[in-house]
Amino acid sequence: MTAISNHIDTIIKLNPDYTQMDAVYLTNKLLNLIGDAALELPGDTDPLTNLDLMVKAAQDNGKIPDSQAARQILEAQLMDFATPTPSRINQLFWDKYQAGPRVATDWFFALSRANNYIQTRAIAKNVVFPAKTEYGDLEITINLSKPEKDPKDIAAAAHATQSGYPACALCLQTEGYAGRTDFAARTNHRVIRFLLGGKTWGFQYSPYAYFNEHAIFLDAIHEPMVIDQSTFSNLLNIVTMFPTYFVGSNADLPIVGGSMLAHEHYQGGRHTFPMAKAPIETQVEISGHPHVFAGIVKWPMSVIRLVSADSDELINAAEHVRQVWNQYTDETVDVRAFVDGKPHHTVTPIARRVGTEFQLDLVLRDNQTSAQYPDGIFHPHQDVQHIKKENIGLIEVMGRAILPARLKSELAEVQKYLLGEANTMKPMHQAWADQLKAKYDWTPANAEIQMQAAVGRVFARVLEDAGVFKRDEVGQKAFARFCRAL
C-alpha cells in the first residue's frame, strides 16, 4: 500500500463526510500538498508513521522548507482531511451525548488523538513518577512534550508581520488556523460549543496534555480571567454536564495565576489528583449555610473543601468564603488583602462530582511580594527554585508537578555527583546535592529511586511555600482564626 492510499483509509475511517468514492479527489488534494512524485511512495500501516513519510516526501519534493513550523503546519493540513468540519463535529458530539456524556467525550477524545491534534507521541516523552509525602502520593512530571523552538523558525518569526490574529492560543479563532512560525498549526483543531451562564463557550482538549483527557473550557470572547460567583456557578454547571470530569480555574491574579490570564478559561479532565484524595482534617462552619459541609483539607496549601447536594447553596457558600478571604488580613503571618489599595487575595477553585454531591475546593491565594521574597511571599522560595521557579497554577495546586525539561539532564548530572562520578552538575543544585549526599547513602542500585523521592520532597516544599497558612502551629492557629471569620 502507498502512503497516499493508507492516509485515505485513515480519512474515511475518521471522517464520515468521505467515502471510497472520494479516493481520486482525495489523492489529488494530498498530492497538491506533498508533490506528484509521492504518488507511489510506500506507506506504513501506523497512521502517524505514515504521516511522517508524507511530510518528509513534501520536504524532499520542495513543497515545504526544512523547518519545524513548516512540518507541523503540513501535518495539521493532512490530518484536517480526517477531521469532520466544526458543524459536523458538534452535531455528532451532541447526538452521542444523548447516549451519555461519557459516550460523547470518549468519542471526541479518541478523534482528537487519532487526528494528531493531541500530540500523543510528544506526550509519551514526559517523565512521570509518584512521590510519597505526608500529604499522600504526589505526581511528578518533567515536561518534555513541547518541542524546542527551531532556530530557523525563531529567525523567521523575528521578521514576520504581527497581525494580532488570533488574539491568543485559546481563542475560538484558532479553529482551523493554518499556523505560522510563531503560532501553532491548528488546521485539525475542533471546538465543541455549549451554553454556560447564558454565554457561548467552547470545549476542547489540550494538545500537550498534562493528565488524562486534559480538557479546556473557554469563553468564546477573548476577555480576562476573573474569579467571582459566576465562576463557581460555571464550574458546577460543567461537572453537571460532564460528571466524569473535574473542572477548575486558575486564579485571576499574577504570580498565583496561570500563564494565560488574558483569556477566561477553565481546565478539567478524567483524572483524580492527589488533592482530591486528601482527607478533611478539621471541620469548619460557614455562617448561614448549615446544609454545606465544610472543612480544612490536609494539604500543603491552604484549602477549604465545601460539599453539598444543593449546587445553589454551595455556590453561595463559596462566594461567602471568597468575599471574606478577599478582605481578610492577618499581619502576624504576612497575610494582607490590600497593600497601597491594590488587592492581593483570590482563590483557585476546583469542582467535582462525588456520587450525588458536589465538591468545591477553594485554595486560598495571596500574591504579595516583599524585599525578602521578590518573586512572591507565597511562591516557591529561592532555595527550591533550582527545581521549580514558575507560577504554581491549577494543576500543581492539585498535586501534579509540571517541571521544566531542563531537569531531565540536570538531575542526571546531580545523580552522577552523588555517586562520585565525573559530572557537569550546575552550581544551582550544589547546596541541595550536598544535603542529599550527607543524609543518604547513594549506590547505582538506589540512586534513581532516591533522586525521585528527593524531587518529590522539594515539590511538597514548593506547595508549602505557596500555602498562605503554614503547616506549623503558628500557621494553623492563623488558619483557625480565618475560619472563625467565616
UniProtKB/Swiss-Prot annotation:
Pathway linked to the protein: Carbohydrate metabolism; galactose metabolism
Domain of life: Bacteria
Keywords: Carbohydrate metabolism, Cytoplasm, Galactose metabolism, Nucleotidyltransferase, Transferase
Enzymatic reactions: alpha-D-galactose 1-phosphate + UDP-alpha-D-glucose = alpha-D-glucose 1-phosphate + UDP-alpha-D-galactose
EC number: 2.7.7.12
Keyword Ribonucleoprotein included in the entry's annotation: no
Compartment list: Cytoplasm
A GO BP annotation: galactose metabolic process
Chief location: cytoplasm
Pfam families assigned to the protein according to its UniProt record, in alphabetical order: GalP_UDP_tr_C, GalP_UDP_transf
InterPro entries in UniProt: GalP_uridyl_Trfase_II (IPR000766), GalP_uridyl_Trfase_II_CS (IPR023425), GalP_Utransf_C (IPR005850), GalP_Utransf_N (IPR005849)
UniProt GO molecular function: UDP-glucose:hexose-1-phosphate uridylyltransferase activity
Entry GO terms, CC: cytoplasm
Enzyme class: transferase
HAMAP family noted in UniProt: GalP_UDP_trans (MF_00571)
Cross-referenced PANTHER family: DUF4922 DOMAIN-CONTAINING PROTEIN, GALACTOSE-1-PHOSPHATE URIDYLYLTRANSFERASE
Family: Belongs to the galactose-1-phosphate uridylyltransferase type 2 family.
Name of the featured protein: Galactose-1-phosphate uridylyltransferase
Organism in which the protein naturally occurs: Lacticaseibacillus paracasei (strain ATCC 334 / BCRC 17002 / CCUG 31169 / CIP 107868 / KCTC 3260 / NRRL B-441) (Lactobacillus paracasei)
Encoding gene per record: galT
